[in-house]
Amino acid sequence: MKLLIKLSGESLSERGGDGSFYAEPVLERIAEQIRALQSQGHQIALVIGGGNLFRGHKLTEKLSIERPTADYIGMLATVQNALILRDYFQTKGIATRVSSAIAMPQICESYIPKRALRHMEKGRIMIFAAGLGAPYFTTDSTAVQRALEMGADMLIMAKNGVDGLYTGDPKKNKRATFIKSITGSKVLEQNLKAADQSAIALAKEHGLTIKIVGVDMIKSALETKIGSVILPE
């Protein structure tokens, strides 16, 4: 299968640690899980967020910074995370390439869909950075867009601190119940916080299945007993 995995930036740091942006034990666990999926014969691409480094809305709230500028700064944070993952993966023997929607030829490739597909066919992990290269789009939307462009069979959204989709935030609402399977239409109707709503709508429109799992269960994401499934219809 061809899989695209969406990782949040926060998943790269360790909760309760020293407050650093990256934690090697976490990076090692992610690398091991990616390797496990790859060893099963799957082609894998990643989209990484930048929330561990920067969130644009926080800057616009504190300073007179326009939203597009803040969004571009957030895109740069995703590039930094992508480079960290690339180099770390390669120290573990996992061939990896970074493709950026904003041209940065000194440090990574520019996003060219056919080239990215070729890397995946050769067994390399592909990391897509800098979002879609335009403001007002989240990395959730980027993940759906790249999954569709790459012809992915499934988008795996790896969540930090939860094991799937719930009717509410299980950390704040003890009555929140786990959802094993649901359609994209129901997610939108019930305003469930699975992902950005525009991302869910895009996946629904184009028939893309989304699997939501905990970040520590990436290697088992294809097992039916793991996580939650958002079906197009």
Indicate where each model-derived feature is located:
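C-terminal catalytic "cap/lid" subdomain
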Residues: 1-233
